[in-house]
Amino acid sequence: MHKDLKNVLLSEEDIQNICKEMGAIITEDYKDRPLVCVGILKGSVMFMADLIKRIDTHLSIDFMDVSSYHGGTESTGEVQILKDLGASIENKDVLIIEDILETGTTLKSITELLQSRKVNSLEIATLLDKPNRRKADIEAKYVGKKIPDEFVVGYGLDYRELYRNLPYIGTLKAEVYSK
């Protein structure tokens, strides 16, 4: 375990099991329907890469880069779109893939934007969910694990762009982010 972590919430094995189970459900839900998977950069990259390997249907991928943190541990509520999709999603089945759903402010903004583009359907898959933090009226259809309200890093999740490369997810020690 990394020295800056207080504990490990999800091991590599836990994460792979979540991807396998979620991938099977998504495969069943979208069988015989092409799917556009939209990863939210940067955090979702590792989860998306592992999840889409487990989805057995025709799919394409695209990415959006959106920020509401601006370097801290709390969402500012102000959503900035840094990179938009590269292709049209009109009349397509779209699955947003996110690393973590907390306040929901960011995902609510993204879903409203994508729905305005006349998609056929739009759902959310998230590895982690913190329902106690929810401020926006939004839920993910596919949830890997509900977790307590602690600041987590690893497997794509960061604190000031660090810890994304950890192959597991852990809780960051308070003294690390309170400096």
Curated annotation (Swiss-Prot):
UniProt binding sites for diphosphate: K42, G43, R164
One annotated Gene Ontology cellular component of this protein = cytosol
| One biological process term in Gene Ontology | purine ribonucleoside salvage
UniProtKB keywords: Cytoplasm, Glycosyltransferase, Magnesium, Metal-binding, Nucleotide-binding, Purine salvage, Transferase
Listed InterPro entries: HGPRT, Hxn_phspho_trans, PRibTrfase_dom, PRTase-like
Q: Which GO terms describe its molecular function?
A: guanine phosphoribosyltransferase activity; hypoxanthine phosphoribosyltransferase activity; magnesium ion binding; nucleotide binding
Q: What catalytic activity does the UniProt entry give for this protein? A: IMP + diphosphate = hypoxanthine + 5-phospho-alpha-D-ribose 1-diphosphate; GMP + diphosphate = guanine + 5-phospho-alpha-D-ribose 1-diphosphate
Q: What does this protein do?
A: Purine salvage pathway enzyme that catalyzes the transfer of the ribosyl-5-phosphate group from 5-phospho-alpha-D-ribose 1-diphosphate (PRPP) to the N9 position of the 6-oxopurines hypoxanthine and guanine to form the corresponding ribonucleotides IMP (inosine 5'-monophosphate) and GMP (guanosine 5'-monophosphate), with the release of PPi.
**Which PANTHER family does this one have?**
HYPOXANTHINE PHOSPHORIBOSYLTRANSFERASE (PTHR43340:SF1), HYPOXANTHINE-GUANINE PHOSPHORIBOSYLTRANSFERASE (PTHR43340)
Identify this protein by name. Hypoxanthine-guanine phosphoribosyltransferase
